[in-house]
Amino acid sequence: MIDYKPVVQKKNLKVIEQREESIYYNKKSEDGGCGGDFKCDTASVSGSVSQRACVYCGARVVLNPITDAYHLVHGPIGCASYTWDIRGSLSSGEEIYRNSFSTDLREKDVIFGGEKKLSAAIDEIVAEKHPKVIFVYSTCIVGVIGDDTDAVCKAAEEKYGIRVIPVKSPGFAGSKSTGYKAACDALMKLMGDKTTDEKIDGINFLGDFNLAGEIWIVTNYLKKFGIDVVAKLTGDSSYDEIMNAPKAKLNIVQCAGSMMYLAKMMEKKFGIPYIKVSFYGVEDTKNSLLKIADILGNEEKVKKAKQFVLEEESKIENELDYYRDRLKGKKAAIFVGGAFKAISLIKQFRNLGMETVMVGTQTGKKDDYEIIESITTEGTVILDDANPYELEKFILEQGADILVGGVKERPLAYKLGIAFCDHNHERKHALSGYVGSLNFAKEIDLTINSPVWDYV
């Protein structure tokens, strides 16, 4: 008989000294906690192998789901590899967003400049595709050689009478969060400076990218009690839809890391108030739906919303009880991009009778970590911008049974011999709303209680 041993033995792993301020054991605020000297939302420590992506990546994942937009990457062809299907975003209409274009800058262009090549690429797209809007992304090399993409885009707009929006996203200018801001700036530029007194009785849904059709789940919920969605930013959205966004009465923001900047700009320019929401998990889905109904609805809409929530919860409660019995007492580790998702995941695990023993994000802010501290138990490891070495250390130290993360974390979990759940934007199954809560419980049960772990 083969003597199976753990894939990785526990060992004394240490973290980089400069990273210690971004790692905190929850002591329930006896020393100031995450509201004290906890360091987050800063540049990554050099050499720490941060899991964050570049500025261009951040801008691209936000803008790419606009279904009828053309995306032109001004840079080497390698940058254009990060294009097709980078999110599992679905469309109810156009599929243009699944195509991508590149100026394919070479050594000669680096020396003599790439503006003429960019202008020619725009000319070709207009001649062959007749676009309504083109987003032009600056990459690292463009930031180095100093091509004036603003001037090229402005000239193209005047020449063709269409929108050509520069996205200032050279990768070395920051991290993925900087790219989010670049994308928000591009969206504001697209919507323009004109204000309007005309309002539509509905909401804009910011920070949902229609992964596996999740935005359709939520919009169908809202329709049940009479709330219309004016524009979706940016999952399953279109140019015409986005141009209507300034007319909405309320912005709801799910992924605050990527879209809070836009929500604040829209409040300042168009007078649209915003609220944070999350449709991950039974608890947050309920709270978000009732909050929206309370703000926008009359007494009848609020009544319908409460009735809808009760009906949906009753449909899945028995099945959730089944999974609670199988998962009770298990320990979870979380490392995701956005803090809103981490907060919802902690609540979901708690609802399933599981304890979160480690939680980290790539883009969390101080107030996000204060919330995380308040809803986790004493001893939970809280960390910002972690690297694989740190994840390994605290997963082993805390005895986690499962890691929830993205594709970059999957190999680490399997090497450590623990279960894994993909909650990133590459996934193809819905985890939002009530149906998503049930799907999540099923997936956690399948991976934690898989017989494969008997052989590890």
UniProtKB/Swiss-Prot annotation:
Cited Pfam families: Oxidored_nitro (PF00148)
GO BP of this protein: nitrogen fixation; protein-containing complex assembly
Family: Belongs to the NifD/NifK/NifE/NifN family.
Alphabetized PANTHER family for the sequence: NITROGENASE IRON-MOLYBDENUM COFACTOR BIOSYNTHESIS PROTEIN NIFE
Keywords: Nitrogen fixation
MF terms (GO), sorted A to Z: nitrogenase activity
Summary of the function given for this chain in its UniProt record: This protein may play a role in the biosynthesis of the prosthetic group of nitrogenase (FeMo cofactor).
Listed pathway(s): Cofactor biosynthesis; Fe-Mo cofactor biosynthesis
Domain of life where this protein originates: Bacteria
Protein name: Nitrogenase iron-molybdenum cofactor biosynthesis protein NifE
Coiled coil: none
InterPro entries noted in UniProt: Nase/OxRdtase_comp1, Nase_comp1_CS, NifE, NifE-like
